[in-house]
Curated annotation (Swiss-Prot):
Entry keywords, A to Z: Glycosyltransferase, Magnesium, Metal-binding, Transferase
Binding annotation for Mg(2+): 297-298, 300, 324
One MF annotation (Gene Ontology) recorded for this entry: D-inositol-3-phosphate glycosyltransferase activity
Quaternary context: Homodimer.
GO biological process terms, semicolon-separated: mycothiol biosynthetic process
EC number: 2.4.1.250
Catalytic class of the enzyme: transferase
Protein's name according to its UniProt entry: D-inositol 3-phosphate glycosyltransferase
Family the UniProt entry places it in: Belongs to the glycosyltransferase group 1 family. MshA subfamily.
Species, as recorded: Frankia alni (strain DSM 45986 / CECT 9034 / ACN14a)
Pfam families to which the protein is assigned, alphabetical: Glyco_trans_4_4 (PF13579), Glycos_transf_1 (PF00534)
Upper taxonomic lineage: Bacteria, Bacillati, Actinomycetota, Actinomycetes, Frankiales
Binding site for UDP-N-acetyl-alpha-D-glucosamine: 8-9, 16, 222, 227, 310, 318
Binding site for 1D-myo-inositol 3-phosphate: 2, 13-18, 71, 104, 128, 148
Described purpose of this protein according to its UniProt entry: Catalyzes the transfer of a N-acetyl-glucosamine moiety to 1D-myo-inositol 3-phosphate to produce 1D-myo-inositol 2-acetamido-2-deoxy-glucopyranoside 3-phosphate in the mycothiol biosynthesis pathway.
Amino acid sequence: MHTSPMEQPGTGDAGGLNVYVVELSRQLAALGVEVEVFTRAVSSKLPTSAELAPGVTVRHVDAGPFEEIHREDLPAWLCAFTADVLRAEAGHEPGYFDVIHSHYWLSGQVALAVARRWGVPFVHTSHTLAKIKNGALAVGDRPEPPGRLLGEQEVIAGSTRLIASTADERGHLIDLYDADPDRVDVVAPGVDLETFRPGDPAQSRARLGLDRDGDLLLFVGRIQPLKAPDLLLHAAAELLRRDPTRRSRLTVAVVGGPSGSGLEQPDALVKLAADLGISDLVRFQPPAPQHELAHWYRAATAVVVPSHSESFGLVALEAQACGTPVVAAAVGGLRTAVADGVSGLLVAGRDPARYADTLDRLLRQPHWRSRLAAGAVGRAAGFGWSATARGVLRSYRHALSPAAVAV
């Protein structure tokens, strides 16, 4: 409800969830499942429906003004969204939909009401959990509101089945939300192995206008406190403090847009780079389509994912699929996405000096980087979207079985 699969990931509220819904829908359609995606219309110019891929239809629901609405204000439009979904179903024969799959707690609220009305099971994927986010808040982040905590609990309790991205998330659902262990399936997200694959770093650097021989540290994602791009800037400044000669060969690229804003260069990060004395090294880029993003990954010496929390971390998978080692926070799903010491390196804590230590070792040892790069490709190879779709389809079948827990 809060974002559309048609939007460009990396800005506003568009991120890994968008990629997940798009790729999962495509792969489910390839398995013979007819998919309809309901999302809120943010413009009066959008068609009522559009084909995302063969077998996948996106339906734009009228709920609220035709503009972006802050997530905290969206609960006021849940009833309108639900009513429009019910109207869409009324145009079909009874029993047209077999199962509902909701993504994020807001959509889960709609699914809960609609599933009861239609008498069909519903499967829910949280993507993020309020209790986990509130336990790992960044400076400048607002805690998730009580309404989300209550709504999320209701969705988790009322779903037919739950899909967790990792065993850790499954544990959180059981321990923090009292989810029935027998109703929670673990299905890892995937990566598009056709788009994100190894290539010639020199060609990618030439395409992007980057120095052929320098070191490139890359951040990809929404510019928000949770993702902590500021930590990368502090770590880069620490690298230069230790070795000023690095300045001539080091570039830090931040590819993404600020969450909830249309600005291409987030003012706070620009100011931080200036305050740290590294403005000349930092390159801000707007969100890039996937085919261009793959060039950024291939061009990078290392991709840095310093998030405070991640349910999985698709950026880490995409980078590894391109053969680039990842330096990531040892939190949440990143501990599953990245094989520490094999495909990348996990850093405990929030100290920029620790990141600088890790990056320093990586930059100084090209042979070690090469081993990690090979390990990265192997790690990502086990996470194709087709495997994700098969796992999700198994969850649907469990939900549809007579023994499924009633909604």
